């Protein structure tokens, strides 16, 4: 089912309109903005990842999901022709597939200028605007960069949840699962988790080693950790996760002389206090922490077009 959230009354009489997407593999958030009255609306469709999906698959999502939503929002069956600018930020938008994604969007939004970029640049623009800063993504996985106000200057490779992704939900899940079964966390926490989640040791091993999307399962344990954050052992685990993220990633950008660090993603958002403690420990100051980049992306593009 497609979800939409109205942030303000949306006008149907439009002039210059822009469409911005923040896309992951499971969900894409789209924000539609009309320049003549300042109103905007966010809608969601299934995820688009040009690295894993074919041109035909992407175009079907655009035609069957995005266009009907736009037509409904704008009360116009020719809604695609009203869009004059499209910015698409996606997790799978590596250099090798940028032209592919641009082509898919151009085929739908023929009247629009199209820009396609990776999710890290989108996060940096949403968090820092046109100012230099350190931008981080902390969700299921993690990523970070030093951004000079225009482009990403340096990106410490996150290496994924097996080799890296410090600070992420998946990394927190690894620490948690390891801790409850190797005895580094108290027995009562292990029993509480197994009972609340109605899961066994064997099922956990199955999900991690034999089922797909082990990273998402590991990250899902962060909900339990957050729920029981009053337990000092779990609070310490969260702190250790963020300390590791700063030590192995953020500290590598210290030579640029910028101390402000900002983050997007549910792990940074819900565990913000621990994130701020880790930042201070390593000599940084937290500027912004947002759960989603979509409104920051819109603010960036509005300012750029003025």
Where are these regions (language model features)?
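ATP-binding/phosphotransfer module of carbohydrate and carboxylate kinases, centering on a glycine-rich
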Residues: 2-83, 127-134, 175-306
